[in-house]
């Protein structure tokens, strides 16, 4: 295999020669910093279809495996050109559309005239273009230290409208400033109300209130300068009074915010509103040190700044837009018994899929050592595992409800005068599906019978010793067999057992009981398959929902008979009624 450096030997000279032979004029060549190739090329009218164009072509280190950057200041097009950086869109964004054999001359010959024609055409002229929109909001340069959270589905507003806004600000991970849009008003009428769940996720960050203004312009601002955009929005807005959001205390900036909306493409021939926030910081009050014997210190003020803050769409429909087959999960509820290593990974992915309500049961506490396999994080250690995963669910999907419960299945005691059977039966009848992630055969037998009695779909998942393999079993009320049938089929050999790697248990220091060994990434394979099975079962009656695979039992092998790792191998089986199973006796 040739190295990238050998691949580029003599390439610049070859590119220049091919451009000249194809009828382009190379006006200048430069090597920035001795490494980055930049060519200034004149493309004649017959190559552009519009007149001569001076092109600046930058070849990255990864060229010719990745495409060049081509810009021109001779054109201003509404499409297929970056409005500020002036890049020409000659090919679709994915690198699979770049053909290295084209070289520069071939790229320009094949794409330049087409891109110019498409960029200068009126909307709907039927040119052969990729089916995507060009949202203008994607072209601005935003602050990397802040984000503006909105719900797309609630932004049905008209051009020219304006009003007051209320927001909450919080400092999230890595000190990032998060501004959550709470409400927008036009006079006394509410024009936008944030969804309830969005605040829940940020309550641990203790958000503060923030007031400001909003306006919808008739077109995107044609400048990338935040200060100029602030001025444009202020001139278009009828309001002249502003709240003082923060006192001018030492170290605390006074903030003003304007949310700016404008029409833009959201898809091919689909128009919606683009948004961003302009954040104005009036500067912080700082006190210079007082010189000895010189009276009061001098009060200094840092300069005011303006920032563009990108709008991040965080409504319920925004979170599920990329997964259409899971639409409807927001109305489903699951009970998960066991929030340990395998259960936690499953819970995380069910939350990402959009399950609307979780009842989480576990008896244990999350320890730092658990994090090698557990889906929790260091900020959740010392919590009950059920509480840690309820917190994780809300971090992932603020619209999901998660109820943790410290619960020990098999504990010989009453809870508020109720037996565990009464508690679990009431829980099972209130949910759409029960998951047993305890990896305890006695508990599996118990919960499967309770699910059978309450006609509740039931799924169990577990890894074998050493995580050489794993098992996922689904039993629904209309199934032919039950979990007892599955166990008997395995003992009879009609359903195989997953590979096990028999190694000694380990007892970490301070832990009350030994635990199995094995890597979290192996365990996750089982949890992910269980998520597929569960989502399929929950979406069974939903048109175009995530489909079931048609199996009741799923057996995984991750190791061969010698204990060597192999690519994951799943086998699926139907669990038929076993003649020796007494659970079906009337």
Where are the regions that the model predicts?
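A short, basic/flexible loop-to-alpha-helix module at the beginning of a structural domain
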Residues: 307-334, 422-425
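Compact alpha/beta protein-protein interaction domains typified by the UBC
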Residues: 25-95, 100-106
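A structured beta-alpha segment of the ubiquitous adenosine-cofactor-binding alpha/beta core
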Residues: 390-432, 438-441
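Domain-level detector for trafficking modules
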Residues: 81-139
């Amino acid at each position: 295999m040739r190295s990238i450096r050998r691949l580029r030997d003599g390439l610049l000279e070859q590119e220049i020669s091919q451009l000249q032979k194809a009828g382009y004029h190379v006006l200048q060549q430069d090597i920035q910093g001795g490494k980055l190739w930049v060519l200034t090329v004149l493309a004649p009218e017959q190559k552009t279809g519009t007149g001569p164009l001076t092109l600046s072509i930058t070849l990255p280190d990864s060229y010719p495996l990745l495409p060049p950057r081509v810009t021109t200041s001779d054109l201003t097009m509404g499409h297929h050109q970056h409005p500020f950086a002036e890049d020409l869109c000659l090919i679709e964004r994915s690198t699979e559309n770049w053909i290295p054999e084209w070289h520069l001359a071939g790229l320009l010959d094949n794409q330049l005239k087409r891109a110019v024609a498409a960029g200068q055409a009126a909307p709907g002229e039927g040119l052969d273009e990729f089916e995507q929109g060009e949202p203008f909001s994607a072209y601005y340069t935003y602050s990397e230290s802040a984000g503006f959270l909105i719900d797309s589905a609630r932004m049905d507003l008209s051009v020219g409208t304006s009003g007051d806004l209320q927001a909450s600000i919080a400092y999230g991970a890595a000190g990032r400033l998060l501004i959550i849009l709470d409400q927008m008003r036009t006079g006394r009428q509410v024009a936008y109300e944030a969804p309830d769940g969005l605040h829940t996720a940020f309550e641990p960050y203790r958000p503060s209130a923030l007031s400001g203004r909003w306006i919808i312009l008739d077109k995107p601002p044609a400048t990338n300068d935040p200060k100029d955009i602030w001025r444009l929005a202020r001139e278009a807005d009828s309001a002249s009074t502003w709240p003082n959001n923060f006192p001018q205390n030492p170290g605390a900036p006074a903030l003003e915010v304007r949310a700016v909306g404008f029409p833009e493409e959201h898809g091919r021939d689909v128009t919606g509103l683009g948004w961003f926030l302009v954040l104005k910081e009036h500067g912080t009050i700082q006190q210079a040190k007082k010189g000895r014997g010189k009276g009061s210190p001098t009060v200094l003020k840092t300069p005011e700044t303006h920032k563009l803050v990108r709008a991040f769409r965080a409504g319920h429909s925004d979170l599920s837009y990329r997964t259409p087959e899971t639409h409807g999960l927001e109305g489903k509820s699951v009970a998960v018994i066991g929030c340990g290593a395998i259960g936690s990974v499953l819970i995380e992915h069910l939350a990402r899929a959009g399950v609307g309500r979780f009842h989480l049961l576990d008896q244990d506490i999350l320890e730092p050592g658990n994090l090698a396999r557990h889906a929790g994080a260091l900020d959740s250690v010392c919590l009950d595992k059920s509480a840690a995963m309820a917190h994780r669910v809300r971090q992932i999907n603020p619209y999901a409800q998660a109820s943790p419960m410290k619960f020990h299945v098999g504990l010989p005691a009453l809870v508020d005068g109720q037996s565990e059977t009464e508690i679990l039966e009431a829980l099972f009848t209130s949910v759409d599906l029960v998951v047993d992630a305890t990896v305890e055969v006695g508990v599996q037998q118990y919960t499967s019978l309770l699910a059978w009695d309450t006609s509740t779909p039931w799924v169990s998942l577990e890894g074998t010793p050493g995580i050489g393999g794993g098992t996922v079993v689904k039993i629904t009320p209309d199934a032919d067999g039950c979990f007892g049938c599955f166990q008997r089929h395995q003992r009879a050999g009609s359903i195989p057992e997953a590979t096990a790697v028999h190694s000694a248990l380990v007892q970490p220091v301070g832990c009350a009981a030994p635990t199995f060994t094995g890597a979290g990434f192996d365990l996750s394979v089982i949890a992910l398959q269980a998520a597929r099975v569960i989502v399929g079962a929950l979406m069974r009656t939903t048109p175009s929902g995530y489909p079931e695979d048609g199996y009741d039992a799923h057996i995984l092998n991750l190791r061969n008979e010698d204990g060597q790792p192999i690519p994951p191998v799943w086998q699926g089986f139907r669990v038929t009624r076993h003649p020796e199973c007494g659970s079906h006796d009337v």
